[in-house]
Amino acid sequence: MAKITKEIVFGNHKLILETGEVARQADGAVMASMNGTQVLVTVVWKKDGGESNDFFPLTVNYQEKFYAIGKIPGGFNKREGRPSDNETLISRLIDRPIRPLFPDNFFNEVQIIATVLSLNPEVSPDIIAMIGASAALSISGVPFNGPIGAARVGYKDGVYLLNPSRKEQEESKLDLVIAGTKDAILMVESEAQELSEDIMRGAMLYGHEMMKNVIKSIEELARDVGKSKPEWKAPEIDTVLKARINDVARNEVEAAYLIKDKQQRYQRLGELREQTISALLAENDELNADVIANMFGELERSIVRNRILDGEPRIDGRDHRTVRPISVRTKFLERTHGSCLFTRGETQAIVVATLGNERDAQILDGISGESRDRFMLHYNFPPYSVGETGQVGSPKRREIGHGRLAKRALMAVLPDANEFPYVLRIVSEITESNGSSSMATVCGTSLALMDAGVPLKAPVAGVAMGLIKEGDRYAVLTDILGDEDHLGDMDFKVAGTEKGITALQMDIKISGITNEIMERALEQALEGRTHILGVMNNALAEHRTELSQHAPRITTMKVAEDKIRTIIGKGGATIKGLIESTGVSIDIDDSGVIQLFSPDKIALEEAQKQIKALIAEIEVGQTYQGKVSKIVDFGAFINLLPGKDGLLHISQICAARTQKVEEVLQEGQEIEVFVAGIDKQGRVKLEWKDKPQAEAKEVEDAPVSATFLTMEEQSEEINSGNKISEEEE
């Protein structure tokens, strides 16, 4: 196939889609480029074998190559390894809008691989990868009801920004990624700084409108390639069997969905499913048990959806707008820094906040460069939370995605590092789940952080919205259950403060979501969020004024840059000595900011005291308790401050000209001295403050000039006695 190229004006950028030159043995391959960022996206699908599957085996792998930015990977092997969290999240970003566009009952294996080959740091590759995946699918011949487009939308000074650069994004109050077909929005992922519902809705509509030009160009590319799609027909529905299942099971299934307890309801539905399969196989042993089970599921879906659309109570008895009962317990765990048990209906999370110092920040080494993450949020979904057995270990894609959504919801309200210098780690342990566990994590995180004494700018709550739509009839549901998510048409999660939205995630399974439906969903989400915030504020309205007794303390000091070397010492000896003697963790940066970290308040105060002494300057007219550090023929050097000595002249020590300094003072002896002066060369002249009067008189009467050398005459000796030599500096 000859090389085919499409150039698309996309905001301030030019998007280029190319096929026919690279990866020609894949069913579909597109090189998507934008201002120096290039992503190769390939699609391969199996033409048969789907009959043996009862699910759709779609796999999306997004991978970043370090050579794309001219870097060599770190680590022992010096090659790319397991996917980073960012790669996993972008894989999900590609997967979510395209998965609903494959036909029902299409179970053939499909694999999409997106590889970043070249990276301009100012142009994010995620949008390019999403568009490339859409184009590759459209030319692959796989049954696909696309194409889709994708766009990133920012918001600054009342203006929406299309595909902002990284620099522009840093100044934006919104980071919204949207994907959809020319007729409908399918997926939204966003982080915002407390923006209103109207601004968020406007951003979605703006992004959807802007991507239509991309969709049109992909359609043209597919026509130019001209690959014919193989005949694929969905299996014919056995209407007789469907009617028979309805006759056998409908009444019992309707009754089962009146059981409000999830586990009891699931147990009863499982029994009914097995009874139905057994009864129908007894009537006709040629029937397929899996087909019967799938049709039984369709019956469940029909019953639940029609009941809601008819205005009847939902599965757990609520109306469309009511939030499930909520209970909150802060200080749930005794020795953690902050904790919360958040329960909403049959969804429950133990959320724990831990405070650390700068050394605990997570180092992220990706192709965009190394960075440090001061706020980590880890979401765990153990199998017992849904009454099942399963593997426990590394987080799965879903856990990484849910954790990132909850993290995004809190980013807008975190205190600045100079106001609260702690590194924060949140762990959310989902102990029960029946829908919206990510939003329970948002609520629990806000409470756990405030319980730990973190001064959040405002509390944050989240709620998951659902949709049931048949023709022109629809119902928007607040705080959906797991079954309502599974059997419904939309999962729309909204988190925010009383002031506005901080995070929004939407996945839609159908086309035709109107502006009216979106407006209704946002309005109900605000109502639900406000209610949840009220319950949370009744439990803990503001952050605790004192940190937990088990939490470490951080003190920050600022010193002049020319004092950094003094604190560190030769080969780090001084700072190591401070750390060993006090047990305090000490970090100092190039600007002179020192961070002291310890669970022991007394140790912190001691470390501060020692550092202040290290950088303190000797002042004329002040009295110091010094220690004799060195005795010389013409006097004694007295250590006043760490690394700083002064000279106590022999005339201030000895009463007679025949007396030696060693007869009066010994090294290590402590005496009180007065700083009489400091000359231009920085030499410190001392007087012995508590020298006996008799000795003082005798010294005054003695011909000092004939017996002792003056300070000026001993300048070389004085300089040689300084504690910090030029070599040490």
UniProtKB/Swiss-Prot annotation:
Entry cofactors: Mg(2+)
Cellular location(s): Cytoplasm
UniProt key word RNA-binding: yes
GO biological process: mRNA catabolic process; RNA processing
HAMAP family: PNPase
Function: Involved in mRNA degradation. Catalyzes the phosphorolysis of single-stranded polyribonucleotides processively in the 3'- to 5'-direction.
Similarity section: Belongs to the polyribonucleotide nucleotidyltransferase family.
Protein name: Polyribonucleotide nucleotidyltransferase
Biological classification of the source: Bacteria, Pseudomonadati, Pseudomonadota, Gammaproteobacteria, Legionellales
